[in-house]
């Protein structure tokens, strides 16, 4: 089977030259642009690049276009099913925010093939990762505690719903208006009624269980990132100054890849396991 690949630069070029589905994605003038060449400003993730689109007729939207290997027809069909399930708000899923989305099969035209896209509401706010570290620097223990409780609630709601997620991290949870949590990455969204695809993404290295690259879809290890986030927020809510020592502003709240790979050698694990206040709480 022929494998198609695409670069971000090719996606931007197609948007600039109107080689895309204008009817479904919207006029080029609505796509956020900027320097140095006044071209579409894309926010690249691990497998897709996201553009902001403002329109007088529609709400502000996020347009997610995959780069690298183009999704297969099977993947597109699966995402369409997931989109319909989200719209139905089954099993009380309206109690927490899995952001709904539409799948545009023929979205961007590059050479002799078409690239799909996901279109979803634009969520204004800060990522959990950014907000948590900002709160810690500001010594906002109350804010950190509220974030922790919100993540705990999110985990419980996942357990009660038919949905699950294969790539939770501090970067794909947005904190929007009124402190609401929004999961903005639907690529590894799961539903009990849909057959799971082959394992292709192993999760963010600062959140995922190290054994993820040796297993198939497994709910317990897919919830492991939530535990990493809860422990990180709990530790920061008790001792915000940990933000000055552990984690980084780009990839992690507290834990980094080496902490999860080699906990016995981790300074962070050693601190948390031997700190009286952390243990007692």
Predicted regions and their residues:
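Conserved structural core of kinase catalytic domains
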Residues: 97-145, 196
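Activation of the activation-loop gatekeeper triad in protein kinase-fold domains
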Residues: 185-190
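Juxta-kinase regulatory segment immediately upstream of eukaryotic protein kinase catalytic domains
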Residues: 1-41, 78
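Conserved activation segment of eukaryotic-like protein kinases, specifically the C-terminal portion
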Residues: 197-212
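Helical subdomain adjoining the active site within ATP-dependent kinase catalytic cores
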Residues: 235-281
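ATP-binding glycine-rich loop module of kinase domains
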Residues: 36-40, 46-99
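Conserved end of the kinase activation segment
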Residues: 211-221
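Catalytic-loop of the protein kinase fold
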Residues: 155-176
């Amino acid at each position: 089977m022929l494998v198609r690949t695409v670069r971000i630069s090719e996606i931007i070029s197609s948007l600039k030259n109107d080689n895309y589905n204008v009817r479904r994605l919207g006029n080029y003038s609505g796509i956020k642009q900027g320097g140095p060449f006044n071209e579409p400003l894309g926010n690249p993730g691990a497998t897709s690049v996201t553009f902001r689109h403002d329109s007088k007729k529609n709400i502000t939207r996020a347009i997610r276009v995959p780069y690298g290997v183009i999704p297969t027809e099977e993947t597109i069909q699966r995402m369409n099913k997931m989109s319909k399930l989200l719209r139905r708000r089954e099993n009380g899923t309206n109690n927490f925010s899995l952001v709904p989305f539409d799948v545009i099969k023929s979205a961007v035209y590059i050479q002799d093939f078409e690239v799909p896209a996901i279109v979803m509401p634009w969520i204004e706010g800060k990522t959990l990762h950014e907000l948590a570290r900002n709160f810690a620097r500001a010594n906002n223990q109350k804010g950190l505690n509220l974030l922790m409780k919100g993540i705990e609630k999110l985990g419980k709601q996942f357990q009660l719903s038919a949905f699950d997620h294969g790539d939770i991290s501090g970067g794909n949870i947005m904190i929007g208006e009124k402190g609401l949590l929004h999961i903005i990455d639907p690529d590894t969204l799961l539903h009990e009624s849909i057959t799971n695809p082959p394992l292709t993404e192993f999760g963010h290295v600062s959140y995922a269980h190290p054994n993820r690259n040796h297993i198939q879809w497994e709910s317990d290890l897919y919830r492991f990132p939530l535990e990493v986030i809860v422990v990180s927020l709990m530790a920061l809510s008790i001792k915000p100054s940990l933000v000055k020592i552990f984690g980084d502003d780009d990839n992690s709240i507290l834990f980094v890849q080496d902490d999860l790979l080699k906990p016995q050698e981790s300074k962070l694990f050693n601190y948390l396991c031997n700190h009286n206040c952390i243990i007692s709480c």
